[in-house]
């Protein structure tokens, strides 16, 4: 029989295994393009660092979904806790939204800054700067897809050391993502990102399937065939583009499941959706998790 002290110690270990760091602003002062100083005007990053005895040395920036109008916590902190359990340092990105008056390229700028921030502070967080990925669901998946198709090497002459770092992720994880701004898009996400009646040039620029190149990082993509708000064609289009460009990828399409299903579980993650275990297997293949 467990004593009360034993039970408390066990609970303490469980809590410490899922530790959340302090939310931090991506820019020390006002963010570029800020429309004000309210919380929704300040993009942030919240670290979920892996315990020292289970740190794989890899990191993933997580972009929650929400149609570019909100941020779903079950696609943010919950993902970070799951990754943390597997030794990956998760960083949940609070990016600026169309519902607060922001439009492209603000969101992509926030995602790029998040990648640069993790890379710049990699030593402090005991992270390999060559093992930093980005993950997103739904509209967050679109943001992640733009981050892996529109990146740069950084500005070597920048005064801010973070701006000198590359914004290229080393891996992409796209969960039932919005990919295209064309036929199969999610209209709410498109409107929040680009506004009403965007020019064709902008529609093409933000249709990620049109911008996959050889240097797009290896990507894990999954969707359900039953998804109606964001049709599976989005993932099929992106996987086809990855294949054509010769980029390593994994594509998983599951028959059942509503849009926005996430992990379909909560800590301690005993009954997650199969995609989560498929992702762990893929991350081992990429060297993000020890085999």
Give names to the regions the model predicted.
Residues 20-54:
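N-terminal cap/lid segment of alpha/beta-hydrolase-fold proteins
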Residues 29, 161, 177-211, 217:
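Mobile cap/lid helix-loop segments that gate and shape the active-site cleft of serine hydrolases
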Residues 72-73, 77-78, 93-129, 267-272:
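Catalytic nucleophile-loop/oxyanion-hole region of alpha/beta-hydrolase
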Residues 221-223, 227:
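Short beta-strand/loop motif that positions the catalytic acidic residue
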């Amino acid at each position: 029989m467990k004593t009360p002290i034993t039970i408390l110690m066990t609970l303490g270990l469980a809590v410490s295994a899922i530790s959340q760091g302090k939310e931090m602003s991506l820019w020390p002062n006002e963010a570029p393009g800020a429309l004000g100083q309210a919380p929704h005007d300040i993009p942030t990053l919240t670290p979920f660092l892996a315990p020292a005895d289970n740190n794989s040395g890899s990191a993933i920036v997580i972009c929650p979904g929400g149609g570019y109008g909100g941020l779903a916590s079950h696609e943010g902190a919950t993902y970070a806790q799951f990754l943390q359990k597997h030794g990956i340092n998760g960083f949940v990105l609070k990016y600026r939204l169309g519902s607060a008056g922001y439009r492209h390229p603000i969101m992509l700028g926030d995602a790029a800054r998040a990648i640069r921030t993790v890379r710049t502070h990699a030593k402090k967080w005991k992270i390999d700067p060559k093992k930093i990925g980005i993950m997103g669901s739904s509209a967050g998946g679109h943001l992640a897809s733009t981050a892996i198709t529109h990146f740069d090497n950084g500005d070597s002459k920048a005064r801010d050391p973070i701006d000198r770092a590359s914004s290229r992720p080393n891996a992409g994880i796209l969960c039932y993502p919005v990919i295209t701004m064309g036929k199969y898009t999610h209209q709410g996400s498109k409107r929040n990102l680009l506004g009403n009646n965007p020019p064709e040039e902008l529609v093409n620029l933000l249709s990620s399937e049109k911008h996959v190149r050889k240097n797009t990082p290896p990507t894990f993509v999954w969707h359900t065939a039953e998804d109606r708000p964001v049709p599976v064609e989005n993932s099929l289009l992106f996987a086809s583009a990855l294949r054509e460009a010769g980029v390593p990828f994994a594509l998983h399409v599951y028959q059942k499941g509503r849009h926005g299903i996430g992990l379909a579980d909560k800590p301690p993650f005993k009954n997650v959706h199969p995609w989560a275990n498929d992702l762990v297997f893929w991350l081992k293949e990429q060297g993000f998790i020890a085999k």
